[in-house]
Each structure stands twice: as structure tokens, then as C-alpha cells.
Amino acid sequence: MPLAIFAQTQSKYIVVDQFGYLPESKKIAIIRDPQVGFDAAETFKPGKTYALVEAKTKKQVFKGKLTLWNEGKTDPSSGDKVWYFNFTNYKKEGTYYILDVEKRFKSYDFVIGANVYKEVLKQAFKTFYYQRDGFAKEAKYAGEGWADAASHMGKKQDPNCRQWGLENDASTEKDVHGGWYDAGDFNKYTNWTSDYIIYMLLAYEENPAAWTDDFGIPESGNKIPDVLDEVAFGLDYMLRLQFSSGSVISIVGEAEGSPPSSASEPSYWGSPSTSATLSAVAAFAYGAKVFKTINPSYSNKLLQAAKLSWDWAEANPNMKFYNNSAEHKTQGLGAGQQEVDDLGRFEKKMQAALRMYEATGEEKYITYFEQHYKETKMMSWSLVFPFGEYGQDMLLCYTKLPKAKPEIVKDIKAIYAVETDTINNLFAIKDHTDPYFAFQKDYVWGSNGTKAKQGNIYYNLVQYNVMPEIKDSARSIAESYIHYLHGVNPLSTCYLTNMYMFGGDKCTNQIYHGWFKNGSKKWDEATVSTFGPPPGFIAGGPNTEYNWDGCCPEGCGSKENNAMCFELDIKNLKNQPQQKSYMDFNQGWPLNSWAVSENSNSYQVQYLRLLSKFVK
């Protein structure tokens, strides 16, 4: 039932960014009437006049009429009929809400302010601190609720980790402590760890002003931007993965525990591979470039490591390692498959070559890049899409090089411009295909990460001066993807966990995570368990392909296991419109919530990159 507030009733049908809006940005509240999906029986008929109301004084500071989306048709992706209340022209800073003047329904409170997202950025960034492996979380940084001793530092764990398949061979022991739990699982995948480092460095370089030294981590106040401190934490871990030959370990499999320090099973490392080693080259070299003026000795250490690994990868171009594979006798090592295909390995070499050139200025690296750039996905497929961001962003970074060849820059930008203005990208935006202003074609596993990547696709038009004629609208489009993640969606849900202390009103309360797991009295669900998950984790998001395990409903091995299929009613999750294919839950097998609610550092870093563009 709605909550009555001073003769005004808070309504989930009046949807806003729960944190707020920048004064100069487009500001549109969405009014929704459900037509299709689990809430189709509900109804909301808005009044004729809406107002922006100052929360403290209850003064109506701006009034207007609603406009109807698409002549009142039902949007298939959300199952909703939608109206808009546009208050873009009101720019005075303060705390406000939207009011249906006639029917006395109101939205959540939100802020209009020049730095409305800074605290959100801090909390979302701090999730990497909570994901740190082998590092104590002190209460003064983590909060009393999430303080924990360093994890995976016991016998046969990270400090003396042994190779998978050679568990009884002490000669394989290697110190692999540090790095980050990858997602809701605690494994550490080198290919992906490198990506997180690259994207943190990229976010920093693209807008250094957003990345200050006061994000509340142990390194805060050391006169180095906290994002670079976090990068260094990741790079230090990757240096430990390197052998004297230059090869780099592909994966470290970790046991789970709640809290993580309670994990007691051994850790195992997987064999070096070409892809992992090239990933390390890119991270080391990019780090060497950025740290050159900040910490020259550290920069040189990274550069020497990068050169060593480059040479090994050149001599060993096709070394593969498949984890968690019955075929390769690695079942149980990690969860997701970190090995890449031939094209993925090629793009990793391209990234490594680009970053080595930036760090060294040596022509051999950029010559390789320029000779092969047309073989990348974007250039050879003529396609810009959110699942190709690694190569797309790499190519755009080339266009910023002082000595980039003008004809190659022109070629890259031309393809990016043409392929961004297609039916699944800008054309859909211009056609108002999604009434929630954040169109994406598919809602599958990790759709919230895809939203962030889609927003970054559009901000790249601004960042890399690809389509200067639409610079302002491209920025506004990118910002709309942030609003979606902050609550401008059919579920009126902020997809960041537990942000109630920082402006969130209806937040993600549960994620699938080995620490913040189902059944934990301390960390299961925000508002129910003692603490819930920490603030700022991005949940996976709507997934139209979600299903319970194939053993359900009657083949899970026992009556007790079969009963677990019905531990939670999932009818409101299945067979829904795309944007409603989500539920706030964190059950494990056989309900398999990880396909919907699990966090991932990959989602997080893409969101951080996008959000930081709107922070001063």
C-alpha cells in the first residue's frame, strides 16, 4: 500500500532518478500505467497538471502538463503506457519531488545539484575495496557491518597457492594474494582483472577531475587519486602472477565464505596462457604510462614487466588454458570461462601493442597496430555494439595519439559514426523506441552492465569528437542510461545496493554473492538482515533468458532439493516484458538467482566510467 505523506501519497508510478539531476541537464519524470506483465492488473491514471515541489517548503516551483508517449500505445519492452513531465528548464539547486496536483500523488524526493552524483560515485567505486582479496577491511573504512580480516591467507591458500592438478607438488607454490573477487564468486580471472584496470585508468584519463583522493579507502589522503590507488592494488596482484619467463597465470580459483575471511579451502592457480599474458602486458603498460609522473620507480617496474610478458607472448602466440572444463580436466577451477577465441586473443594483442607504444614510444608496437587495425571486430564487421566495447574503445584511444595517422583516425571515426547511427543505437533513440530513454536491444545476463556500456558508446561520441554536430544530445542520451540505473525504469528500482543513506529510496536489497548470501542473518537482505550488502553494488539486471535449474521441479535428486525449486515464487520473473524480467532475490541452486541479481566488477567498472563523466 502507498505511504501517506502530509495528504500526499507516494507513488511508484511517478518515476525519477532517485539521486537527482544536474541543473543544466534534461530532467523528465516518467508517469507509468502498467498494461502487460506481473503488474498488469494495477492501474494509474494521472491528473492533468503536474508540479515540481520544493521538499522543505512544499512550494510548487514549476508546473506543467503531461505529454503522452507514442499516442498512448503500450511499450512492448516495459509493458507500460507512459507520460512525461518535463521540468528541464528549472535549474535552481535544491531538494524536490514531483506532484500530481489533482490526485495528490508524489514521487520520491531527489536533488537538483551541480555535483549530485559525487557521493554515488564514491560508494559505487568503494565496492572494489569490499571485493579486495587478501586485504583486511577495517571498520573505519568498511563500516562496522562489513569489517573483516584478510581472506584467503591461510594454509594452502593465496600466499602459497599450488597449481591446479598438482595439489601435492609443493614446488608449484606461488604467492598470488591480492586482486579482487571477480563478482559474486570469489575467483580471480586475469583476463578480466586486466579489463578492470584498463577501464579504471581510462575513466581516470577521460575525466581526472572526478577522481579525487577522498573516497574513503585506506589509501585516501596520500595525494594520489584513489582510483589510481585501487589500480595499483590490482597491478601489484598481477605482478605476482608473472613468472620469470614473462608468462602470466590465467586464473586463481578461490573458496567462498561469509564473511570471506572464513573461507578455509585451498586456492589453486591455472596454467599461464597467451591471452592472460597479453592482458597483463596491456595493464602493466597502461599503468606504466599513467604512473610515470606520479611514481617513476613503480612505472619502470611495470614497464619492465610489460616488456618481459610481451616477449613471452610473441614466442608463445597460441597457449590456451580452459578452466572449469570437463573436457580439459579442470572442472571446479573457477566458474565462468575466461579463455578467449582467436579474435579475442588478437584484440588483446592489439590492446597490448597500443599500450606498449604509449608507454615506450617504440615504433614496432604502433606499426603492428596500424597494420592490423582493420581486422578488429568493429572494422571488419562494421559493427558498434555493447558487447564489442573492448576493441571499440581501444580503437578510439588510438585516435587521441599525437602521432596517429590522419587517414586511420578518419577511418575509425567514420565507422564508429556510421555504426552508432543504426537501428539498435542512435536510430532507436531518435525514434523514441524506449519510453524510458535507455534503449537496448536485448535484456540478457548482465543487462545493467550492458546499459552502462550502451551509455558509454554514446558518450564516446563526445569524448573522442566523433560526431561534434550532436555533442550535446549525445551527452544527454548517455546520461539517460544513468537515470535508468538510478530508478527511471518500469520497476522504479535503483539498481545499486543499499543506497538508502545516500539518497536512494527503492534500492536493490539482495545480490547473489558469496559474502552477502541468502540466509545470512547479517548480510542477506538490506532492510531485513542486520546489515545487508554494502552500498553501491550494481546488480545484474533484467534477464529474459532466466530460468530455474533444469532439474526443477521434480528432478533435483531428493524431495528436499525439489522443494527448493519452490522456496520462492518466480512467476513474476518469467515470461515478462524485457524491462520487468527482474526480481530482488539471491537464492542459489536450483533457483539460480545469479543470472539476474549477481554483481560483477565488469558491470561496476562500466558504470563508474559512465557516471564519472557527470561528476566534477
Residue ranges and their predicted role:
Residues 242-250, 317-322, 361-364:
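Proline-centered turn/helix-capping motifs that create local helix->coil transitions or kinks
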